[in-house]
């Protein structure tokens, strides 16, 4: 948890870290995978170790929550809140979340508890940090579900889209055609195309 990600080059170079960048006030100008973007106050962006990030301008207050998959034991968690979940593999573009007042208050509460937990030196600290991280991820996952309009009965359909992007990350060097990914998912290319259209991807 840091409010000075831009001032620590080692964090920027670490390719094992998942990140949430949360602009709490003002703006933050970033370059994500060679695309410049300006985040506004209140926005939260989840990023994977594959993203290349450069902070171009800080004009406010922001917080970066960083973790690696070993800390979170991520692959043992439910798919939707894992590193292969909706936040990190929900679509081809960077997910920008805009929490409402209630969710913003929840994120502030979680961030405050995370900061407080870092100050405690005991054997329970690591587990408490994991629990708080999961709360942060679940809160952001709910925001992403609303953004992608994933209705309660439609999770399975959207899960196919998520699995597609996980496979693309794994096999993009050797597999270039949608048909190849459709085969891996045991679906037809037309089914995938219809799902992408349904979710505006």
Model-derived features: positions:
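Amphipathic, well-ordered alpha-helical segments in soluble domains
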Residues: 19-22, 106-110, 132, 136-139
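Short, Lys/Arg-enriched, Trp-marked, Pro/Gly-tolerant hinge/linker segments that flank
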Residues: 98-101, 121-128, 140-166, 170-185, ...
């Amino acid at each position: 948890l840091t409010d000075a990600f831009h001032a620590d080059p080692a964090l920027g170079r670490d390719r094992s870290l998942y990140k949430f960048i949360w602009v709490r006030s003002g703006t933050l100008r970033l370059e994500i995978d060679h695309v410049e973007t300006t985040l506004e106050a209140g926005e939260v962006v989840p990023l994977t170790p594959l993203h290349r990030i450069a902070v171009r301008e800080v004009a406010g207050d922001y917080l970066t929550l960083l973790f690696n998959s070993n800390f979170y034991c991520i692959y043992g968690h439910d798919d939707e809140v894992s590193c292969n979940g909706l936040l990190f593999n929900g679509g081809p573009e960077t997910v920008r979340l805009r929490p409402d007042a209630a969710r913003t208050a929840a994120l502030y509460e979680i961030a405050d508890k995370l900061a407080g937990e870092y100050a405690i030196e005991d054997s329970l600290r690591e587990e408490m940090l994991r629990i708080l991280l999961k709360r942060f991820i679940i809160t952001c996952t709910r925001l992403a579900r609303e953004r992608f309009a994933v209705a309660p009965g439609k999770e399975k359909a959207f899960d196919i889209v998520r699995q597609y992007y996980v496979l693309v990350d794994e096999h993009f060097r050797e597999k270039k055609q949608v048909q190849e990914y459709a085969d891996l998912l045991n679906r037809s290319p037309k089914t995938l195309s219809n799902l992408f259209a349904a979710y505006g991807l």
